[in-house]
Design a protein with these regions (language model features):
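Structural motif
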Residues: 14, 99-100, 125, 366
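Conserved Rossmann-fold cofactor-binding substructure of NAD(P)-dependent oxidoreductases
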Residues: 63, 73, 79-111
């Protein structure tokens, strides 16, 4: 069994951004360039490159990053590697040159696995920003043992899905004196006068994910995990649409990967570190009754069309129409991103020190908050890059074995939360029990 041996020393690059010319990839390039020029790498430097199919598009990404950051040297100093996800030999050649790949090649259900496979086979770590539970859990099922043997870390969901939620649960747990047994999170998005939108790549992932729910159920049956033990009182699930007294808004269950990722983290911590698992539910606020009506109508359309091939093709072709403008082929403008932010409130409950969680009702509560800039294309690159930096800088604090990990599973013993705090994604305690 290999331990912490992947990402062989002496490779040309430490980090490689694959899919750098994609909509999200371009912002990952900008964030990585900013961090590489910062204090942490001022003396040692950071060797990194960009990779993709089209040289001219990659050159354009570097040019725009150079202009945005006032760093003209990027255009000449950052190497470009030509690589096609559909060409295994080009993936192998790329992986052999770098310690870790930052994979921005979504939808991951179509393009993610070849990258993971090449990374595992070539002893290269892989970080992605997928929010697709079937892909994430499928990579665990297929590659966890191989990655462990190679000493390689494959770490998924390292963007807005699901770093704030996964690390937020750990932050909340660590700030409660006693045993945290359950958390509800409420995610709110904030935008400026021009509103906001999301690039349709995320929309496509949602469409395909919904249409393949049976596949996810079958995969989980194949994995065959036993249910996690419930510590303390069993958490009650909310309705499909409900009014949140905590946030004074209507809310719905969060449809991303957060619940899947957090549950996998809690399983890893319970089975490997004997830490008490935390029950977790995730919700999104939607505002007042008018927003609820609009959401229900859009949701019914989505449910109807996503079931059939022809309907899915219409949803993909006309994202702006079917999502009421929330998803577009162009993505948000820079002004929209500058004016947008997110807040995730976490309401936890548990048992005080000395109190048996199996006896009686929870007797302590805690409220924490994770907040940051625009979620998809500002916070996501921040999270992804800080995950990569932590992987490079704190290898000894990662799990002893390689494998396919969640962010919380990989980084629970590192300073990742501290790094995120320093770079714009802030974790704070709002209220805690009296000592």
């Amino acid at each position: 069994m290999a331990t912490r041996g992947g990402g062989a020393a002496g490779r040309t690059y430490e980090l490689m951004v694959l899919g750098a010319s994609g909509f999200t990839g371009q912002f990952v390039v900008q964030e990585l360039a900013r961090v590489a020029a910062g204090d942490e790498f001022r003396s040692s430097g950071l060797r990194w490159a960009v990779a993709g199919r089209n040289r001219s598009k990659l050159e354009d990404v570097l040019r725009r990053a150079a202009e945005a950051l006032g760093m003209p040297q990027l255009k000449s100093e950052i190497d470009i590697i030509i690589c096609d996800v559909g060409d295994p030999s080009s993936l192998d050649a790329m992986c052999k040159q770098t310690t870790a790949v930052l994979s921005c090649v979504g939808p991951y259900r179509f393009y993610g696995e070849p990258v993971v496979k090449a990374c595992v086979e070539n002893g290269t770590h892989c970080i992605d920003i997928s929010g697709e539970p079937k892909y994430l859990e499928g990579m665990y099922f297929k590659y966890n043992s191989q990655a462990a043997d190679k000493g390689v870390y494959i770490i998924g969901s390292c963007g807005f899905d699901s770093v704030p939620a996964d690390l937020g649960v750990l932050f909340t747990r660590d700030n409660l004196k006693g045993t945290l047994t359950a958390i509800e999170s409420f995610l709110s998005f904030h935008s400026g006068p021009e509103g906001t939108c999301i690039h349709d790549g995320t929309w496509q992932s949602a469409i395909y994910g919904f249409s393949d729910q049976d596949g996810l159920r079958k995969l989980r049956k194949q994995i065959g995990h036993k249910p996690l033990p419930i510590i303390g009182a069993k958490q009650k699930r909310r309705g499909t649409v409900f009014y949140s007294d905590e946030l004074k808004q209507y809310s719905i269950p969060f449809l991303g990967s957060d619940v899947s990722v957090v549950k996998r983290t809690q399983r890893y911590l319970y089975e490997n570190l004997e830490e008490a698992p935390v029950q977790y539910s995730a919700y999104t606020t939607v505002g007042g009754i008018a927003s609820v009506v609009k959401l229900i109508f859009a949701g019914l359309l989505f449910l109807l069309f996503a079931k059939f091939s022809f309907g899915r093709s219409l949803l993909i072709k006309y994202p702006k129409f079917f999502s009421f403008g929330y998803f577009t082929k162009e993505g948000p403008t820079q002004k929209q991103m500058n004016d947008s932010s997110f807040t995730m409130m976490m309401f936890g409950e548990g048992y005080s020190e000395g109190q048996d969680p199996q006896q009686g009702k929870p007797n302590v509560k805690i409220c924490t908050q994770v907040k940051g800039p625009e979620a998809g294309y500002v916070a996501t690159p921040i999270a992804m890059v800080q995950v990569a930096v932590t992987l490079l800088k704190e290898r000894s604090s990662l799990p002893q074995r390689g494998g396919v990990y969640t962010p919380g599973g990989a980084f629970s013993k590192t300073k990742l939360i501290e790094r995120l705090n320093q770079n714009g994604i802030q974790f704070t305690v709002i209220t805690r029990p009296e000592a």
